[in-house]
A protein has these predicted regions:
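Active-site beta->alpha loop and helix N-cap motifs at the rims of alpha/beta catalytic domains
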Residues: 9, 18-137, 156-160
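Surface-exposed amphipathic alpha-helices with a cationic face
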Residues: 12, 42-50, 104-114, 164-174, ...
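Terminal or standalone catalytic/regulatory effector modules within metabolic enzymes
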Residues: 12-30, 264-272, 276-507
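Conserved, mostly hydrophobic/aromatic
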Residues: 93, 149, 200, 223, ...
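Catalytic cores of alpha/beta
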Residues: 133-137, 186-199
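Glycine-rich phosphate-binding active-site loops on the catalytic face of alpha/beta enzymes
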Residues: 153, 199-216
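C-terminal helical cap(s) of enzyme catalytic domains, especially alpha/beta-barrels
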Residues: 212-235
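Structured functional modules or segments
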Residues: 515-591
Length: 591
């Protein structure tokens, strides 16, 4: 919060911004993960802009609200009431499937709260995402009461001329304000900005040094110079204030933000045109890629196979995205569906590199997308996907997606009363808990701040030691090893380790102290690397030692690449040990 409050006056002093994006999904979750209250952050961040007459702007994921999974209608409605009270003027609502049924309720919620409803067209490039497709979608949203339209070119792969035609087509329906949002990575967006402006676009999203270009927006200075030359009336930039803001952003990055930003994020890459993945997720993709590459090369090392390079894996991933995307119905590649398609492609690549078949692991959230529970897919599913769903007894859904998620605010009111937690000004704490239950609990307990500080310390040490020889990590792991056809359970440790540590490794929780006799029981191994969780939300009851489970029943989750992957029992039986704590990292084949 202190950084936001510090930089706001200099942003205002620049004198060139009509609007500033102040909050939304990423913003609020980052605050919670940082161990701070996002409600305080939004109020203090929006205040100076309001006082200066600059409109404030937030992002809304429609059915998903501010998170990666669907949100009950009562929570969505409270969301708008809270954010307007905190100082947000405009809501940019998008549905990752371009299903207007998910967007239209937000128009009503925005108007009821006194906000401007800006509805988005998620731009992608495919045989079905034509100019006519987008103009027709805009018509439906305008007829439903949208105040503005956003051309959300989140991957920067919209073709400039087509984007100009979309804007011109919308303006023929109604002279409504249009805002263009794009990312620079594939290389189209400067031409796209010029085309949409010539067609009548009113607002352009821009970035600034040192966070422009690459996976971010085109730079403010470049866009202003280009539009001025083209004859448009654009505001001047106070360059003295610009340099203040630039300096402060670099200062914040040097503090700790830079530890979470890959230098590769600033690179332009035309290879992004084919897979169409958005710039907003490329940073996390590159981080995930390192873990995925490590897993693949561990497999290859055990079999004396040549190692794979990161570039080789990246190209395989991009090729697999191109294979997967049409087969799952061409969902626009925007949060969360860009992550779903990318994760599905990565799981396929990893499986095939390890001698397995495609589609072996599909997370529940991805199944919800495939089955229609998140909205109507733009395209048709491949027969192989339909056959897999039917084989596993999964049911397709064509009703209103919101009907799948009943109201929950009363439940969270009761939980807050039991915990003696204040619902907050304008019910903002109630909203935060209902929107982000697990993250909010971690914030309230102090665990989020503790974990964040530990992670920053670790990253700083890794950065400092980047050129130093790397020693084996002093960490114990429980593995199952096959010797001449006989499975053995072993504990592996590196360096000087206390024998007590070895004994403790087999049981990370008190419940794990009850272990099956030697020779009895069967291990459940993690099929991938990630973080172990017994539940994925507050509605689930965690399994415990002594619980009976049936084959195929979900017993836990491994969170990888922002997706919770359900781990199912491979046998009927009784849980005799839980070998790791919730939130602990696990490697592939860990017990």
């Amino acid at each position: 919060v202190d950084q936001l409050v510090k930089v706001a006056p200099a942003i205002i002093e620049m004198g060139c911004f009509a609007r500033v994006e102040t909050n939304g999904g990423g913003f609020e979750q980052v605050n919670l993960l940082f161990g701070e209250n996002p409600n305080r952050a939004v109020r203090e961040w929006t205040k100076p802009f309001h006082e200066a007459g600059i409109q404030t702007h937030m992002l809304d994921r429609a059915l998903n609200g501010l998170r990666m999974s669907p949100v009950p209608a009562d929570v969505r409605k409270l969301f708008y009431k809270v954010k307007h009270a905190q100082g947000t003027d405009i809501t940019r609502t998008f549905c990752g499937l371009n299903d207007v049924r998910n967007i239209i309720p937000s128009i009503g919620y925005a108007h009821e709260a006194g906000m401007i409803s800006q509805c988005s067209l998620c731009i992608t490039f495919s045989p079905i995402h034509t100019v006519e497709y987008y103009v027709n979608m805009a018509r439906q949203l305008i007829e439903a009461g949208a105040d503005e339209i956003c051309i959300k070119d989140m991957a920067g792969i919209g073709r400039p001329v087509s984007l100009g035609k979309i804007v011109a087509g919308i303006k023929k329906i109604k002279n409504i304000p249009i805002q263009y949002h794009s990312h620079a990575g594939p290389g189209f967006n400067m031409a796209s900005i010029l085309e949409v402006c010539q067609a009548g676009c009113d607002y352009i999203d821009v970035g600034m040094e040192p966070l422009s270009w690459g996976t971010g927006h085109a730079d403010l200075i470049s866009v202003q110079a280009m539009l001025k030359d083209a004859g448009f009336k654009v505001p001047e930039i106070n360059m003295e204030a610009y340099m203040k803001v630039r300096s402060m952003i670099q200062e914040f990055m040097d503090d700790f933000l830079g530890l979470y930003i890959s230098p590769k994020n600033r690179l332009m890459n035309s290879l992004l045109i084919a897979p169409g993945l958005p710039g907003g997720m490329m940073g996390s993709l590159m981080a995930d890629l390192e873990t995925n590459l490590e897993s693949i090369n561990k497999y290859k090392a055990k079999r004396n196979l040549p190692f794979m390079t990161q570039d080789e894996l990246l190209i395989k991933l991009f090729n697999e995205v191109a294979y997967v995307w049409p087969r799952v119905g061409y969902p626009p590649l925007v949060t969360p569906f860009s992550q779903y398609v990318k994760n599905l492609a990565m799981m396929n690549v990893m499986a095939m590199e390890k001698g397995k078949e495609r589609w072996g692991m599909i997370a529940d959230d991805i199944w919800d997308m495939i089955l229609g529970k998140a909205g109507r897919l733009p395209g048709k599913l491949a027969p192989e996907i339909i056959e897999k769903a039917e084989r596993e007894g999964r049911k397709f859904f064509d009703g209103n997606p919101q009907d799948n998620y009943p109201d929950q605010l009363d439940k969270y009111r009761k939980m807050m009363l039991e915990k003696q937690w204040d619902k907050g000004q304008d019910d903002e704490e109630l909203f935060e808990y209902a929107m982000h239950p697990a993250q909010y609990e971690a914030y309230k307990s102090g665990k989020a701040k503790e974990d964040f500080l530990a992670d920053v310390k670790k990253r700083r040490e890794e950065k400092a030691n980047a050129t130093a020889p790397v020693e084996a990590e002093n960490k114990t792991k429980v593995l199952t090893v096959d010797v001449n056809g006989q499975p053995y359970r072993v504990t592996v440790a590196y360096g000087a380790v206390d024998p007590a540590t070895l004994n403790a490794a087999a049981g990370g929780t008190p419940a794990a102290q009850t272990v099956a006799p030697v020779g009895e029981g069967k291990d459940i191994l993690s099929p991938l690397e990630g973080k172990f969780f017994l539940v994925k939300n507050a509605q689930e009851t965690p399994k415990k030692v002594g619980d009976k489970v049936a084959k195929g029943e979900v017993i836990c989750y491994v969170e990888a690449m922002k997706t919770y992957n359900a781990i199912r029992a491979e046998y009927d039986g009784t849980i005799t040990a839980i070998c790791v704590n919730s939130g602990d990292s696990v490697s592939e084949d860990d017990v």
